[in-house]
């Protein structure tokens, strides 16, 4: 009798712990995703592990993925796979804005994120009635912040259909669906008319392009003459040394875990922009002092990682989450360590800002 009572008690405690970790502790900072809602985008549950293995195999040597035209052409499809694998985990553990921002004294991560996004609208001099393009919009966190801050209309493009559906749902919930539109497409060949946008921006998105010239060229094409473009670029800084094994390991880890066909150098960005016809108005690494470290949130999230790892393992064991989710979650944790090292050593920045303008008269 006592044994039975103890067994029932243990079972009750176990279920209570599952409830606590999954439903109470398992929500994202920005509500909308719970651990039990985790999906792998449009990938069916039985294909998750295979898709993860294919992704990891393709990006095992990042800079080799774009060395030939044939391999470069495969990059968009694997970026799509990457976002199928990680979108729900990002929303659950990070929020609706898939980017970093400098920490602000006495302000929450959410507030720091909003300020970082609103800076884009201010740089673009965005106004009510303007039509802006969000190049690589994800699930639309920046889009909604910029539309609300500026009064502009925003059209976002993402290669991932699952993100399109998530962004549209968030737009409706925020009451911004009349001013925020989302299109599924490749930003290397955008389905928009020439000179159809007043301004454009990309927040930590063009790093997925094998050649930056291609995406910058498309942005140049769809901007109206005189239109402004702001981009936050992931780059290696002048402190990076290719003969330093620790530097190489950190950068390769960032590239492998974030679907990047090779990070570009900081000093390349402006020249590439000029090559496609842009005027460079401003260039600044927003991570430099007096800005506070952008990687603080990653370091503070280590406890959350162990909690979330336990949640993911429990859900996989209960067959609520598909096989392969644990591997994806582990990959993202390891990538976070590489990102932190890149930030602490100063060899990497995710927010090298360039402000560009399409000339009023084409040369």
Swiss-Prot record:
GO cellular component: membrane
Recorded topology in the membrane: Single-pass membrane protein
EC number: 2.1.1.143
Top-tier EC class: transferase
InterPro entries: Methyltransf_11, MeTrfase_SMT, SAM-dependent_MTases_sf, Sterol_MeTrfase_C
GO molecular function: 24-methylenesterol C-methyltransferase activity
Keywords: Lipid biosynthesis, Lipid metabolism, Membrane, Methyltransferase, S-adenosyl-L-methionine, Steroid biosynthesis, Steroid metabolism, Sterol biosynthesis, Sterol metabolism, Transferase, Transmembrane, Transmembrane helix
Keyword Lipid biosynthesis among record annotations: yes
Predominant localisation class: membrane
Localization terms from the record: Membrane
Pathway annotation: Steroid biosynthesis; sterol biosynthesis
Catalytic activity: 24-methylidenelophenol + S-adenosyl-L-methionine = (Z)-24-ethylidenelophenol + S-adenosyl-L-homocysteine + H(+)
GO biological process: methylation; sterol biosynthetic process
Transmembrane segments annotated in the record for this chain: 6-26
PANTHER family registered for this protein in UniProt: 24-METHYLENESTEROL C-METHYLTRANSFERASE 2 (PTHR44742:SF2), PTHR44742
Function of the protein: Catalyzes the methyl transfer from S-adenosyl-methionine to the methylene group of 24-methylene lophenol to form 24-ethylidene lophenol.
Family listed: Belongs to the class I-like SAM-binding methyltransferase superfamily. Erg6/SMT family.
Name of the featured protein: 24-methylenesterol C-methyltransferase 2
Species: Oryza sativa subsp. japonica
